Structures are given as C-alpha cells and as structure tokens.
Amino acid sequence: MNFLNQIRKPKLSDIELIAMDLTSEYMSIDSERALFRKLSADLLPKVERSVYNRRKRRLFYHRDLLRKKLAWTIGLQDYYIVDSMPLEVCKLSRSSRSSIYKKAYETAPDKGYYASQNNSYYGYKLHAVCILDGVFTDFDLTQASIHDIHYLKNIKSMYSDCTILGDKGYLSVDYQRDLFSHKQIRLEVPMRRNQKNYKS
C-alpha cells in the first residue's frame, strides 16, 4: 500500500518502508548506515539510502497518525508524564550566520535556556507527553524561547480525568486550577525551594 503519489511505483511500498523504519527504531538502530548494513539481501535492492531518507521524511504525517492510533489503542491512562528537551540547531556563537528556516518567524529557531544544563542554546524545544510505560501519546516542536507552561494549552484539548506529572518548568497555580476546573486534569509538579510550605 502506498500513501504517496509517485510517478514510478517504488519496489518497496510505503507500508514496508514505515515498518522498516519503526523496526530500526525498536532495535535502537539510530543511523541509516547501521540500518543498511543490517538489511537482508532481499530488501537491499528495493530501496536506496537517499530515496529511503527522502520517502521517510515525506511519510512523517502517516507515521505520526499511526503513532497516535497506537497510543490511543493502548487506552486512556490515569497517569501521564510531560517534559521538554532542547534541540540545538547550531552553537550560539554561529546563530547569526545560521539560515535554517529563518524565512518565517513562526518556524525560525531562536535562543533558549536549558535550566538543567544551566546554559543557553540556539534552536527549538521538543515538548512531549508519554504514559508511564514510555509510549509517547503526543509531542510538539516550538521555538526555544517558548516556556514549557504554554504547552499545557495543547494538553487541555486532548486529555481529561487524569494526572499529569511534570518538572518545575510546569509550575503554575493558575494553570493547575484551569486544567482541573475544565478537564479534571491534576497537574503534579514538585515545589521550588523558595516556595511557601516547601519541604526537602
């Protein structure tokens, strides 16, 4: 089965390519070179590395749809974990020369701060929600300067009647009240040291 409209019918179908990609992720193969070394002899002539990479990018929407369907077939959970991580595009000293996605402000990378590493970086921020077993149910990419707390607006539209565990970056009494009053989402966040009633 093929999702993409291609002039020449590929030897490896889109479903096979997605299956190959997901299998490589499951096997913790994180480079294409390692993947193509492990491919069986009958699969090697069906796809070239450059074509594989291009088709894989074009099939992202279908992979994401599959991931969401899998996440929801696992079923609604009582507990979820929300977190974010930096995605550095280039070193901060080279950010003025970087031309990656700078045509539109909405997609342009920018300067952000990563508290756990205590440093600034240039790029994006990946926000993700997963269940306790580690299966991702949702993720989003934002500019690096976007505060973690703003991702909770997305959570409000997708989840209800659950507990979400987050780090101190998601600490906001207003957001906690809003999530609970509208969707019965309990946001559990550790207290900061300078907070009232803090216990070590």
Residues covered by each model-derived region:
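Short alpha-helical elements
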Residues: 1-200
